[in-house]
Structure formats: structure tokens, C-alpha cells
Amino acid sequence: MKIVLQHLTKKFPARSSVRGRKNREDVIAVNDFDFEIPDGKLIGLLGPSGCGKSTALNLICGLLKPTEGKIFFGEDDVTGLPPENRGVGMVFQNYALYPHLTVEKNIQFPLENLKGADKLSKEEMSKRVLEAAKLVQIDHLLERKPNELSGGQQQRVAIARALVKLPRVLLLDEPLSNLD
């Protein structure tokens, strides 16, 4: 499924100082961005720190709302859809793992709150978790906690967690950092 971004813009308002005066102007993180990703293609966004790469990913997955513009998955306008209804898996730069949960439970976490027809049995959840863990070669680490893993292993947990819901779109922010 192709992804199309049309005139995508994200502005963050200026922050006020303690005395109520503005200490800077509005920040335009993404400005009139037009882009098309063909179906089945893997692409990378390259640019210097602060140029809007992560903001663009957060707009695509729905964690941020665009100031202007549209986002299409195939023919569907997903601009107004909440993140949970977009079918996007997101791997964040900082992994966002739950330190008190095992690797298995971290991967399983997004499956726990599925509702209605999407709700899975415990057996199906376990099967999906094992498949995702095998895919990223961490199936031997399922009983460990995140603090027992290397940075690369933690990133693999985050990737497996994003894959376990079988997303239509997979977004990775800084995907090669810490991989071993």
C-alpha cells in the first residue's frame, strides 16, 4: 500500500517565558512536505538533527496532528484517524520498553488491549509473540528483563513489539542505532 503525504505541515507554537513574554518564534518542524512512498518500498529519511524526520514519522503514525496537509494510506485519508486505528507499528528511537516486564510481556503488550473482532486468545498471543521474537532472533531472551539486554537486543524487542500486531505500515525512528 502506498503512503502519500500532501502539503504536510507541523508548527509548534512559541513558548512563553516565565514573565509571559515570548522567547522565540513558532517552530515549523515540517513545512509543506509532499512525498509518496510506493507500495512495498523501504525508504529512509536522511537529514541533520532537528530537520523534522521524527516529527514526520509521528505525523504519519498519528501521535501528532498536522497543522496542515493530508496523509493517505492507499486511497484512505487517515489524517483524522487516531493512532490505534491506523494500523501502524512504530519503533521509537528510545525503545520505550517497560522495565518491570519480561521481553515476552513487552512484545505482548500491544495485543493486550485489542477489542472486539481483533481480540486474540492467549494461545494466539503467545504464537504471535514467539513468531515476532524469532523473526528478530531474540526468542531465547523471552524470560529476561530489558535491563539484562544489550542496546541492540532492546531495539530488537521494540521491533518485535511493533511487528506483533501485523501492521499495515512499519515506521522506525533511528532504526540502526545500537543494533549488534
Placement of each model-derived feature along the sequence:
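The feature captures the beta-strand-to-loop junction immediately N-terminal to the Walker
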Residues: L46-P48
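Catalytic Walker B motif of ABC-type/P-loop ATPase nucleotide-binding domains
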Residues: L170-D173
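A short, proline-enriched helix->beta-strand linker immediately N-terminal to the Walker B motif
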Residues: V164-R168
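Conserved ABC ATPase signature
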Residues: K145-L149, Q153
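Helix-to-loop junction immediately C-terminal to a conserved catalytic motif
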Residues: C61
